[in-house]
Amino acid sequence: MQLEIQVALNFIISYLYNKLPRRRVNIFGEELERLLKKKYEGHWYPEKPYKGSGFRCIHVGEKVDPVIEQASKESGLDIDDVRGNLPQDLSVWIDPFEVSYQIGEKGPVKVLYVDDSSETGCELDKEIKNSFNPEAQVFMPISDPASSVSSSPSPPFGHSAAVSPTFMPRSTQPLTFTTATFAATKFGSTKMKNSGRSSKVARTSPINLGLTVNVNDLLKQKAISSSVHSLYGLGLGSQQQPQPQPQQQQQQQPSSSQPPPPLPQQQQQQPQQQQQQQQQTSALSPNAKEFIFPNMQGQGSSTNGMFPGDSPLNLSPLQYSNAFDVFAAYGGLNEKSFVDGLNFSLNNMQYSNQQFQPVMAN
């Protein structure tokens, strides 16, 4: 009688789960089991299973069985809620060795549980499984792994050893991490970090692009400052000529007191000035050959030959086929913005009056 009542209770309660409070539904099942056992005392006939079947039937319809009403009252559930969640015109027969139900007056009678000693054990297990509500199999009790193989339906061809347990217990061993493995996990989780990101190529950010641009600008400014330094040193050398030798000073003293010599004497002084210009150009760095101007030779005056204009700082762009025009791209030296970027003052630069001597390789 205990097994048959349990099968009927599981079938009825399966309709009430997830619709009514679970705790009260459990109390409802306990009270219903207690009331059914009390009702079936003296009306249970294993020798004649169908004797007293109408008395043991539980009916829920327009009229609800008094056992259902009493169990709902004891559990604190409303009888209308219980009847509304159960199928209409539900009848459950609880007989010795068999439990069946019917939904509707003209519905088919379906067997939930049957116990026939002539059948094999596999068939009994199949009937026990079918005793639960097929529409709510999620409420089937979960057994331990040892008995889950026997309670599950047997596979065909008798391969019972290949049946896997339907429920595997979760491992109870605590998770342990070393310092290295814990550092490789995600923050707030035990999952490992994605290692695929480490193999990706680092992308260039706008900050990195800005740094490269600044470095290129600094390199350009350094090249411009070195070129202007060499050009300006060449202009000062032509304007402030080094101290001549005593013989040249004696030649210049009478010329300062006398009126300017005629044109033929100026033509005689041109070769000396050209030699001085060649010495000055040879004193430059051999790596700065692009600053040696080919049209400087053959000019009348050294200052006007290099930089034609009113003053040596009033530079005009020179025409060359393969040379880089610094002043056409960045402006003249008189512009304040260009001079400020060079980080030094051109007017305060000091140059020695000693004449540079060319280095001759043996």
Curated annotation (Swiss-Prot):
Its main location: cytoplasm. It comes from the Eukaryota. Residues 144-171, 234-284 are annotated as: Disordered. InterPro entries: Anti_prolifrtn (IPR002087), BTG-like_sf (IPR036054), Tob1/2 (IPR015676). Gene3D superfamilies: Anti-proliferative protein, N-terminal domain. A motif (Bipartite nuclear localization signal) lies at residues 22-39. The modification Phosphothreonine is found at residue 204. Keywords: Cytoplasm, Nucleus, Phosphoprotein. A motif (Nuclear export signal) lies at residues 228-236. It is found in: Cytoplasm; Nucleus. Residues 144-160, 238-256, 265-280 have a biased composition (Low complexity). Belongs to the BTG family. This is Protein Tob1.
